[in-house]
Amino acid sequence: MVYNEIGKTGMKVANLAFGASSLGGVFHDLREEEGIRAVHTAVDNGINFIDVSPYYGHLKAEMVLGKALKEIARDRYYLSTKVGRYGKDGVNTWDYSAQRATDSVYESMQRLNVDFIDLINVHDIEFADLQQVVDETLPALVALKKKGVVGHVGITDLQPENLKWVIEHSPEGTVESVLCFCHYSLNDDMLVDYLDFFEAHGVGVINASPLSMGLLSQRGTPPWHPAPDPLKEACKRAADFCTEKGYPIEKLAIQFATSLNPRIATTLFSSTNSDNVLKNIRFVDEEMDRQLVEEVQRIIGDQMRVRWKNS
């Protein structure tokens, strides 16, 4: 792995990062001890950036991650969590008010067993009034930064144009990083179109979901996936082609996301399986088959950059 700085934050992170959504049992049933072991495996093998949210598993991911972090020295990792999107008893909720954002940070720290958050993000801003994010949510987080409770402030969303709008309408330097998912992967590289803008504003870029939420998988797209059917079918053809070549599409997708653009500081993946963690790290360290990338993208064809709504 290589280590890149997230914007101007001073945080130098491995180009592969651990996303803790799976610790909430988001994708399948979770055995806590396996999830904790996966976190330890990631950190022990060079991954030093961990991202989570109170939304993942409706608090469960933060609680399980907190148990894992108890056993890891605080100077071995950077920790990122979020405010704005929540859930309880299986019902999703959103609250981007200043008071809720402030309270949420302290609640997250308690669950995570830490007294400092390196990066705090406004989560999935497309569900918010973007003007409220600018006028209320972000100033609340900046106030916590001034108090030394958090180190840096960012925003996250599926739609990169929303990230751009909030940066344009906020005081310069307010937003220090963006996290965008499913837009720098084999089937969608739209994030590249925004990198000049982010760089011009000193904003670091974090990529997430290199497998496009399961589109790029030998197992096939999960039934809940919101992508349109033609895109699902194109990605299935691409995955089958990679299997025939003896080169799993998951491997190619991880390599694509982590190796081609140094302006993207890191890419998040999520797993509760220690063997998968080690496998993904090995993928990053191996040379990518660039010709196969071209062949896969030809198969995806007119479904490249096809989008879907967040949910």
Label for each model-derived stretch:
Residues M1-Y77, K146:
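N-terminal binding-site loop/beta-alpha segment at the start of enzyme catalytic domains
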Residues I6, F18, G35, I50, ...:
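Conserved, mostly hydrophobic/aromatic
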Residues K8, D44, A68-D75, M109-N113, ...:
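Acidic (Asp/Glu)-rich catalytic clusters
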Residues M11-L16, G46-N48, A73-Y77, V114-D118, ...:
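Short, well-ordered coil/turn segments that N-cap beta-strands
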Residues S21-E33, K88-Q99, A128-D129:
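Active-site mouth loops of central-metabolism enzymes
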Residues D29-A42, S97-L112, Q159-I167:
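Short, acidic/polar
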Residues M109-A128:
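Active-site groove signature of glycoside hydrolases
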Residues I125-N310:
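Beta/alpha (TIM)-barrel catalytic core signal, keyed to glycine-rich beta->alpha loops juxtaposed to Asp/Glu
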